[in-house]
């Protein structure tokens, strides 16, 4: 009788222990799976973070390198201005200058009479440079205003071609026009590449094309010479008794001397 009463209690205890162990195992399995999935999710998120960081680094480096390449390309146009500095325009003695008029005098000789014209790739501007000792002439076209400036040293007299109602206006941008009006016969200048400039001191004066390798002829008489604007070319301004007169800006004069002969242009 006692044994028959104990058997149900034993079966009940064994069943409870088995159920509890099964529940514990299931909970342990669920926790391990959750931790593994969490690790996988965190690993995926870390991979995404590493990918995004790599992309951001690549984008920054590409942007920086691209801008540096562009800046190198922009500064590459300054090589021509370095080459331009080799030219020289020697000035005349101060004793022969007029005190009331602004003059620019250029002697034509093998050493000092060389003149170079360059057109940059971006603006097609025309630039003439000379050494520090000589009467320097700089024709600069800036990006903002496209202004024209002619400068010379104090010793050789200054020449400034200003844009006003009387002397004509100049715009440094491509295709713009500059008019230097000394008389009714004076010509026009277009700053774009391949345009023409006419300096008319008489009916026989020639034309000028601002592009590289073009030719400029400043004819004051039948004996005057020719000028080629390409690199390394020379300019000969030959004056004689029959040369004409030229007014560059407000009443100012430019004299181009060749040896003992003097003419005004």
Swiss-Prot record:
GO terms for biological process: biomineral tissue development. The modification N6,N6-dimethyllysine is found at residues 111, 144, 155, 166, 185, 204, 223, 242. Residues 108-257 are annotated as: 7 X 19 AA repeat of S-S-K-K-S-G-S-Y-S-G-S-K-G-S-K-R-R-[IL]-L. Due to its ability to synthesize simple silica nanospheres in vitro from silanes at nearly neutral pH and at ambient temperatures and pressures, it is of great interest in nanotechnology. May be of practical use for the fabrication of photonic devices. Residues 20-107, 137-140, 159-162, 178-181, 197-200, 216-219, 235-238, 254-265 form a propeptide. Residues 37-106, 122-265 are annotated as: Disordered. The keyword Zinc does not apply. Residues 51-90, 122-133, 142-155, 164-174, 183-193, 202-212, 221-231, 240-250 have a biased composition (Low complexity). R repeats lie at residues 108-140, 141-162, 163-181, 182-200, 201-219, 220-238, 239-257. N6-polymethylaminopropylated. Two lysine residues of each peptide bears 6 to 11 repeats of methyl-propylamine, which gives a possible template for nucleation, and may also control the silica colloid size within the silica deposition vesicle (SDV). Phosphorylated. All serine residues of the Silaffin-1A1 peptide are phosphorylated. Only minor amounts of the Silaffin-1A2 peptide are phosphorylated. Phosphorylation is essential for the activity. It may represent a source of anions required for silica formation of diatoms. It is unknown whether the acidic chain located at the N-terminus is functional or whether it represents a propeptide. The results of the mass spectrometry differ for the same peptide due to the length of the methyl-propylamine chains that vary from 14 to 18 units for the Silaffin-1A2 peptide (141-158) and from 13 to 17 units for the Silaffin-1A1 peptide (163-177). The species-specific pattern of biosilica pattern of diatoms may be generated by polyamines of different chain lengths as well as by a synergistic action of long-chain polyamines and silaffins. This is Silaffin-1. The lineage of its organism: Eukaryota, Sar, Stramenopiles, Ochrophyta, Bacillariophyta.
